Amino acid sequence: MIAVLVKGVLSPDDAELAVRAGADGIVVSNHGGRQLNHSLASLDALPAVAQRVARRVPVLLDGGIRRGTDVLMALMLGADAVLLGRPVLWGLAVAGEKGVSRVLDIVRDELRRAMALCGVRSVQEAKSQCLLIRKGEVLGDPQQAQPPLPLQAVSRL
């Protein structure tokens, strides 16, 4: 049997409907920057969607992933995995298969470095850590959060 992932989900309600209908996974994505510039950013929609499906199915993030720090942020906001598009195509255009391999190596190395700088030893650990957002809120376990003032701790899940 083939797994079916529902893509283009930005709403927790849509994610719930997809899971109830039998989706094997959710891809949080939009068409911003191509067809609809002013839609909700995938990264902004991710926490609410991930919380709604509550680990019943994998949640993937598509859109805006350019570096390892982007991957880490997505993991901390609830993604189980990310999809890479443009960076891989840029590598392909520049150096073919070797370019694609190099892009993937760079993203992996940046992810490892960002995890080390955050004191995170594994992807699973990253998913349970606190992420500080400069919009005045903290996502993650408020017991782990030690944000500098004036940020406030709020629960993510």
Language-model segments: residues:
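A short glycine-centered flexible hinge/capping loop motif at secondary-structure junctions
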Residues: 64-65, 119
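Alpha/beta enzyme core
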Residues: 1-61, 68-90, 144, 157
